């Protein structure tokens, strides 16, 4: 009995370890073939996932050299720096005063990020426009991003989320419509960004549509390890009867299933 009761726990662990081993093999192959992509990032057990992402992004940029790959490397470098700062308790700007392999890795990552930031300031890639607007407060990048509204260039969930964020205060109903459209762009098996779900719940709360705020809070709970918006907490602000709650819970379950199947349709 003991053996069989442990199998559900052991099998996911075995699968996880297998995936980690495969990823390690891929990174090892990249570093063997192109040592320069890895040499400046110390492999000391800290920030291992972020380090692997940077190496992989460097490799893809080396192979294809597109602006999208430049953005992905910039994003991964930023995450690596954030992790390294946390693990060393050293801010990047102060790191030049200290010497250690991990600090050297921070300096190398920061230097490459600064270089890519400068190189891409004229790019019209929507992700890079967002980067330069949010990181450099570049009004021209914001204007160029907004000019792409309604075009195929923004037909991705992450970009619709960003667009909805722009209109959240000035045109909340438009922001809500954009969030629903973002969800409709997911295919079967895609990882749903829970920020879209929490944004919908928050937007509906702002419109005093408490039933929908509760419903989307409930949906968000299925896509987060630690829910940012709790349907239980939302219930504190607005009393929801038992029958209504059951109906909303069922509607939320239907939405969750549609999102997982990639069949969600905006209302």
Task: Identify what each model region corresponds to.
Residues 116-119, 148-152, 182-185, 189, ...:
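Alpha-helical solenoid scaffolds that mediate protein-protein interactions
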């Amino acid at each position: 009995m003991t053996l069989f009761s442990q199998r559900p726990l052991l099998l996911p662990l075995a699968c996880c370890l297998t995936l980690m081993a495969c990823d390690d093999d891929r990174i090892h192959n990249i570093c063997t073939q192109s040592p320069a992509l890895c040499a400046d990032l110390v492999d000391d057990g800290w920030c291992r996932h972020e380090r692997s992402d940077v190496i992989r992004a460097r490799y893809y940029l080396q192979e294809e050299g597109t602006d999208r790959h430049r953005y992905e490397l910039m994003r991964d470098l930023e995450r690596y720096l954030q992790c390294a700062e946390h693990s060393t308790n050293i801010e990047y700007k102060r790191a030049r005063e200290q010497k250690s392999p991990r600090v050297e890795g921070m300096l190398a990552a920061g230097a490459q990020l600064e270089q890519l930031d400068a190189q891409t300031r004229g790019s019209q890639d929507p992700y890079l426009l967002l980067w330069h607007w949010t990181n450099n407060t570049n009004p021209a990048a914001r204007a160029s991003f907004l000019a792409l509204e309604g075009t195929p260039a923004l037909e991705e969930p992450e970009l619709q989320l960003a667009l909805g964020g722009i209109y959240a205060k000035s045109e909340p109903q438009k922001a809500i419509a954009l969030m629903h459209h973002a969800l409709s762009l997911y295919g079967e098996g895609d990882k749903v960004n829970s920020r879209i779900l929490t944004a919908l719940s928050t937007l509906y709360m702002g419109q005093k549509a408490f039933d929908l705020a509760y419903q989307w809070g409930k949906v968000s709970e299925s896509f987060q390890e630690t829910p940012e918006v709790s349907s239980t907490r939302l219930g504190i602000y607005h009393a929801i009867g038992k029958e209504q709650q059951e109906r909303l819970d069922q509607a939320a379950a239907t939405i969750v299933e549609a999102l997982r199947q990639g069949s969600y349709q905006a209302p």
